[in-house]
């Protein structure tokens, strides 16, 4: 979450008049994240999240995102829900941008997740994959392998400003992944951004998943790869196999991976690392000064790309199944 667009109190009061949320008592911007402008609202009826959808979010995708949250909640997954306006619509307009008021989910994200939390995340991810079955809307993953080269072109010329030799290394990496990317694995709706700041806990109990604005249709195992990258590396860049084992066993407590998914996991993890490297690199080079947003270091994901290049078997991630050692 982030803030790119400021709003005035008068604007917000007029906007909230279309919702049954009571009277505004306070609001503040939320700086974490990089995609939309988000505010925590307090009213006489409780707490809510206000989201203004910025230019990277295609307004045509919003019915998919909001509909998915509704679908998942109906099937028992704990996630935020968009509130309807007086006219029944889920979207309004504020400061020239599509905007929605979302229910507030209790809990906090963990700054230092441990293995037990990784197991909970793996299990919740599998439950989300199950709960999304039957959701009829479709959204291709614009940030999968077909989208990486256009994204790379936006940063390629300046890549060596971040680290010498980066331009050539990433060009080689991208070409390899384009050639070897899997073509046939189990598919469904994936979260595609299940980082620690998008998972809430109350104590050690997972209380819900948030921020579905990258959700799309893609390989289910690609979602697992994203989680391995975002949950199982330590700050020094080392991979914590205990966390990896916990996350994978948590996932497989609900849904077992196929042999093809097990074989593809190292490549999916490598591609996932490149995807987040590329978006971080673009934001690092182009985020306007003064934006209330936390820029994230792309080199963190360069370290992960290099780690995954050396992986031979999914067993090295902590997957303890016969197929992983084949």
From Swiss-Prot:
Annotated Pfam families: APH
Entry's Gene Ontology BP terms: threonine biosynthetic process
EC number: 2.7.1.39
UniProt pathway annotation: Amino-acid biosynthesis; L-threonine biosynthesis; L-threonine from L-aspartate: step 4/5
Keyword Amino-acid biosynthesis among record annotations: yes
Keyword rRNA-binding: no
Protein name as it appears in the record: Homoserine kinase
Source organism of this protein record: Sinorhizobium medicae (strain WSM419) (Ensifer medicae)
Gene that produces this protein: thrB
């Amino acid at each position: 979450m982030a803030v790119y667009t400021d709003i005035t109190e008068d604007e917000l009061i007029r906007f909230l008049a279309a919702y049954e949320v009571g009277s505004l008592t306070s609001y503040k911007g939320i700086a974490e994240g990089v995609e939309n402008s988000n505010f925590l609202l307090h009213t006489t009826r409780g707490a809510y999240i206000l989201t203004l959808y910025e230019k990277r979010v295609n307004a045509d995708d919003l019915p998919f995102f909001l509909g998915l949250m509704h679908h998942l909640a109906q099937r028992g997954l704990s996630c935020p829900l968009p509130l309807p306006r007086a006219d029944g619509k889920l979207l309004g307009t504020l400061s020239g941008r599509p905007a929605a008021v979302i229910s507030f989910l209790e809990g906090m994200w963990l700054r230092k997740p441990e293995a037990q939390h990784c197991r909970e995340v793996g299990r919740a991810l599998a439950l989300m994959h199950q709960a999304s079955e039957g959701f009829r809307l479709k959204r291709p993953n614009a940030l999968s392998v077909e989208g990486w080269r256009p994204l790379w072109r936006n940063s390629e010329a300046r890549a060596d400003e971040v680290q010498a030799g980066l331009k050539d290394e990433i060009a080689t990496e991208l070409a390899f992944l384009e050639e070897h990317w899997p073509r046939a694995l189990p598919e469904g709706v994936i979260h595609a951004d299940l980082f620690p700041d998008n998972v809430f806990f109350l104590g050690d109990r997972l209380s819900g998943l948030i921020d579905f604005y990258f959700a799309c249709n893609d390989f289910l195992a690609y979602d697992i790869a994203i989680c391995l990258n975002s949950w199982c590396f330590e700050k020094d860049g080392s991979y914590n196999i205990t966390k990896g084992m916990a996350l994978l066993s948590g996932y497989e407590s609900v849904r077992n991976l196929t042999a093809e998914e097990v074989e593809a996991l190292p490549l999916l993890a490598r591609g996932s690392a490149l995807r987040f490297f590329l978006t971080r690199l673009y934001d690092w080079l182009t985020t306007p000064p003064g934006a209330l947003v936390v820029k994230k270091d792309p080199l963190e994901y360069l370290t992960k790309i290099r780690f995954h290049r050396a992986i031979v078997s999914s067993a090295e991630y902590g997957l303890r199944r016969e197929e992983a050692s084949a």
